[in-house]
């Protein structure tokens, strides 16, 4: 989208969405970020993301943050990620069939719809163009149908035809064809473009959380699907993951 320097992003506090945030900040965007409390089994990500936002704001970067409560909206979820369910979260690679239990019904489409409304309001108030963006990537497609390019394309068209003023809002997912190691190096590269030192980059990465089953001290298990994928990404990127593991 031309003449656009505003973006609304979904910021879970995980690695993918945090690298998405760096991507836009490095390009000079004003970022409004949104985290969603949908009743997940722990809130470590939500705490970590606040640490990163504070760190970035203290650097004078144009980012705001809001946590949106969606617990009631997801109260009937059958996902193993939902806190009220007793189902054990499976271990192993995302490509394995049992990982389907971690799918949260329609989650990314719901998040996108809320962000589209936020972006449209921002666009109308400022008479400017606004993007919405998610940090979904190629590794998500195997298990999460609402992260595929086809799903995202259809959602984009649905939002466009369902609202007046949609010419001011566009939807993009810049990492949709990248694997996790590629988005990691993209995000780190963005931080270096902004003049971040190694210690700054380590702070940002330390303030991300991916694990589905952390211990009581917040350490990652290293065995669940998202831990396996994260560790693999750091290895392929020839980087050390700074977060603590059990």
Residue ranges and their predicted role:
Residues 1-201:
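ATP-dependent adenylation/nucleotidyltransferase module used to activate substrates
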Residues 215-246:
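Iron-sulfur (Fe-S) cluster-binding segments and ferredoxin-like electron-carrier domains
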Residues 152, 184-187, 205-208, 221-224, ...:
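Short amphipathic alpha-helical surface patches that serve as generic macromolecular interface elements
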Residues 132, 202, 206-209, 239-246:
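Charge-dense, low-complexity polyampholytic segments
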Residues 197-222:
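Immediate flanking context of iron-sulfur cluster ligation sites
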